[in-house]
Amino acid sequence: MRMQEGYIEVPGGRVWYSRVGEGEKTPLIVLHGGPGNTHDPLKSTLHVLGDDRPVIFYDQLGSGNSDRPTDLTLWKTERFVEELACIRQALDLKEVHILGHSWGTMLAAAYLVDAKPEGVQSIIFSSPCLSAERWKQDADRLIEQLPVDTQQTIATHEEQGTTDSQEYQDAMKEYYKRHVCRLDPMPTVMTESRPKANKEVYMTMWGPSEFCPTGNLKTFDYTPQLHQINIPSLFVCGRYDEATPESTGYYQSLVPKAELHVFENSSHVGYLEETDEYVQVIRRFLQKAESK
């Protein structure tokens, strides 16, 4: 499969991209999570979709192979929306499908609602977070299912502002192995991409852990605007996902042309936990969207 890589100038620096495949079908652009993670885990699964269309992966500014500026004012949703527009323009992506995962769904929603771009044929919200407050409420409920001592550790360190302690990190792992990735051992592509992630971006925009939003995304809520998304839409999540099936179904109910799929043996990274089914569901949705 043909692959093209390069850099694109965006507000704040250069971002690295990889274009896989050259089929005639509409390109798919993939927005990774974090904020501050990398494209690698998603590409390890979704590159196979390049057999009949170009699939574009990129590392958002600050992470992976992209420039890592230290200016904290760059880490805001509006700039990431501009970045996505720049990438589409640079690669001449007049028509696209978009797949966003986790934070990538926040970016996708902001892009669709605020930038009102032309040429987006469909949108896939993978393990979505479209209301930070709702995410926090879900996380609080999931934490209540952890061992009592783990719950107490989380509460104590968040109250005392000592979330960088080893105790808090260990408690985080208990939550993550239930609701982020249930595979044991953790897939190599996840462990190897960690050093390329950017904790500063994550802390500035989100917070010290998945269940403690304290950054500038803590007030993020696009649920009132979801009805404006009037293109074929797919919402997917795992049965044990921190992006819970209940909340994912709620978001789906607010979007006019939306469907829902739950991966029964997955948490937050269904694309790694149930790879074959994930690819099958995405492929089927894209074909359906293109047949309309």
UniProtKB/Swiss-Prot annotation:
Q: Name one GO cellular component term.
A: membrane
Question: Cross-referenced InterPro entries, in alphabetical order?
Answer: AB_hydrolase_1, AB_hydrolase_fold, AB_hydrolase_sf, Peptidase_S33, Pro_imino_pep
Tell me if Hydrolase is a UniProt keyword of this record.
yes
Q: Kindly indicate where the leader peptide sits in this chain.
A: none
Which Gene Ontology molecular function entries are recorded, alphabetically? aminopeptidase activity
According to its UniProt entry, the protein's GO biological process terms are: proteolysis
Q: Enumerate the Pfam families for this protein.
A: Abhydrolase_1 (PF00561)
* Keyword annotations: Aminopeptidase, Hydrolase, Protease
Q: Which residues form the AB hydrolase-1 domain?
A: 27-274
EC number per UniProt = 3.4.11.5
Q: Which SUPFAM superfamilies is this protein grouped with?
A: alpha/beta-Hydrolases
**Reaction catalysed by this chain?**
Release of N-terminal proline from a peptide
Active site residues of this protein: 102, 241, 268
Similarity comment text for this entry: Belongs to the peptidase S33 family.
Identify the PANTHER family for this entry: HYDROLASE, PUTATIVE (AFU_ORTHOLOGUE AFUA_2G14860)-RELATED, MONOACYLGLYCEROL LIPASE
Primary role: Releases the N-terminal proline from various substrates.
Q: What is this protein called?
A: Proline iminopeptidase
Q: Which organism is it from?
A: Brevibacillus brevis (strain 47 / JCM 6285 / NBRC 100599)
**Could you read off the lineage of the organism from its UniProt record?**
Bacteria, Bacillati, Bacillota, Bacilli, Bacillales
